[in-house]
Amino acid sequence: MRVKTGVVRRRRHKKVLKLARGFYSGRRKHFRKAKEQLERSMYYAFRDRKQKKREFRSLWVVRINAACRMHDTSYSRFMHALKVANIELDRKILADMAMNDMQAFKSVLEGVKEHL
């Protein structure tokens, strides 16, 4: 007996078209174009999950540097002083303090002043 792919093909097409929701025009409606766009979008998603980490770290560095320069020091000297003073605050927390709680950031800066 010959095996036909009707059910399997329908299931596979439905799966791809379901994932392609939100794409424009034929990239949403036509299986072949949707499949190509889906492969590309999965590549972008994979790549950008890695880039996101880099971009956030650089954003934190910029914010910490801006707050440090308001108090007459540089980012690199501040981070070195933190390490010497054995204060283990990460960049994410420091950037949040610099943006939302300047008083706390200033107290940390005063705490490491002698190590600058």
UniProtKB/Swiss-Prot annotation:
One of its GO terms (biological process) is translation. CDD domains: Ribosomal_L20 (cd07026). Gene3D superfamilies: 6.10.160.10, Ribosomal protein L20. Belongs to the bacterial ribosomal protein bL20 family. GO terms for molecular function: rRNA binding; structural constituent of ribosome. Keywords: Ribonucleoprotein, Ribosomal protein, RNA-binding, rRNA-binding. GO terms for cellular component: ribonucleoprotein complex; ribosome. HAMAP family: Ribosomal_bL20. This is Large ribosomal subunit protein bL20. It comes from Helicobacter acinonychis (strain Sheeba). Binds directly to 23S ribosomal RNA and is necessary for the in vitro assembly process of the 50S ribosomal subunit. It is not involved in the protein synthesizing functions of that subunit.
